[in-house]
């Protein structure tokens, strides 16, 4: 059997419209030769075709899963959306357990996108916690990558309660072993080590005026926040695992640690488990006793 390569070109797409289309305008003789010489087909990479809601942009995570499975897999974000709409999130046993604690810290990305987390999920969790009479702290990472560069300000204004801490996603969601960045997010959430503020909107605007975009916002903490206390529960609400895992693993001493999805193999306190997918591409190749080499990067 000849070697076969499955190469995924991140950000590569097809359109016959020339406006804003660098791929069509570029000189790419090798790609053009392959395309003209061999059979070609186009795949949908967003919305229902990859298990997302109608009209929702795709991303690398859902694209890779769909290619590897060879079928449509309902994504975490869609499953959580359905649970919110039909009310089953309220009775989720892990969430109910987390809300038995008098104080819960919600931790994750504040975004208008739907790649790593969802703004609607934050609102739903806060609403359920309020109904349960639980005191909540809100630790948020401003986005700037899957949302606009300075969209965090408008999102903070839409929140039903003020953040407890705020820091850019470059710190809270590093996945490239830059532990000096992760440490800043950890110290902010765990020990309130950041610039104290009474007004997060003013703090964000000051950063914007200095040319700082959302992903690089420095650490801010509410003036009244004193850090995580004994008996507090933590609930990480990002549904995409890879970008939050590094910070999540930093909270080693907290036994009341919950997550929206299964971040590590040792987790058992997660709200939504991974789907059971049989007969994947790599699984079938493995059953055929063929050798495989998988190459990817931790940072795009």
Show the residue positions of the predicted features.
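Residue-level detector of short, conserved catalytic/binding motifs and their immediate flanks
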Residues: 3, 232-234
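Long, well-ordered, tryptophan-enriched scaffold segments
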Residues: 147-229, 236, 242-244, 252-257, ...
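Short glycine-rich anion-binding loops that position phosphate/pyrophosphate groups of nucleotides
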Residues: 12, 241-242
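Structured core elements
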Residues: 8, 235-238
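Conserved structural scaffold segments of CAZyme catalytic domains across common CAZy folds
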Residues: 243-246, 283
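Active-site nucleophile/metal-coordination loop of metallo-enzymes that catalyze phosphate/sulfate
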Residues: 1-5, 12-171, 177-180, 184, ...
